[in-house]
């Protein structure tokens, strides 16, 4: 009998979090997962109906206990997993705020390392080029252009067009924007 196993495409998102230490040197945030005994960049799978950028920020918060603002997108990586193929999309990012939250149970340590230490310590070779790429890129400020959500039909509204309310679909679109905007 032929192998009828279907290969699944798994999508995930993560970050390369950078900061400048008091000596002016760039540092990289890595997380340690005891289950895999690895040091890696924060990342994880998308929740249903989640934006990639929202996933990247959420996973970094959950695994490393820090809030980030995303910057320039980095090259995605792709690798085989038991269920099929996993593609992980990454963003260069920086920490916002100065508090650390408790990380989830998946990670037992999150720590800052010099670029050289991070390159030596990170377990997966395909994450090294991402660190190099993030460090080489300039700081940036994303510009997001957003058009309003779905509104009531003009024919059903007698007031000023700029005050025309969103319909049910538009309100849902607006709610879905929150994690997207929060990531930037």
Model-derived segments and their meaning:
Residues 2-41, 143-149:
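N-terminal strand-loop-strand
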Residues 37, 77, 97, 150-153:
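Feature marks short, surface-exposed loop/turn motifs that line or immediately flank catalytic pockets
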Residues 44-134:
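Unchanged
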Residues 133-142:
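Short domain-boundary/entry signatures in modular proteins, especially
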Residues 143-184:
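Active-site-proximal alpha-helix that buttresses catalytic centers in soluble enzyme cores
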């Amino acid at each position: 009998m032929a192998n009828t196993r279907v290969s699944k495409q798994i999508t995930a998102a993560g970050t390369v979090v950078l900061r400048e230490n008091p000596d002016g040197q760039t540092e990289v945030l890595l997380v340690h997962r005891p289950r895999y005994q690895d040091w890696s960049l924060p990342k994880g799978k998308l929740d249903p109906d989640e934006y990639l950028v929202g996933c990247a920020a959420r996973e970094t918060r959950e695994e490393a206990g820090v809030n980030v603002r995303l910057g320039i997108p980095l090259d995605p990586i792709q690798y085989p997993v038991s269920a099929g193929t996993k593609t992980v999309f990454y963003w260069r990012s920086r920490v916002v705020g100065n508090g650390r939250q408790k990380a989830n149970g998946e990670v037992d340590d999150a720590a800052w390392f010099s670029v050289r230490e991070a390159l030596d310590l990170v377990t997966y070779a395909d994450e090294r080029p991402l660190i190099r790429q993030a460090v080489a890129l300039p700081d940036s400020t994303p510009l997001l252009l957003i058009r309003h959500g779905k509104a009531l039909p003009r024919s059903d509204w007698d007031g000023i067009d700029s005050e025309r309310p969103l319909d049910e679909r538009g309100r849902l679109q607006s709610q879905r924007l929150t994690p997207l905007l929060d990531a930037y």
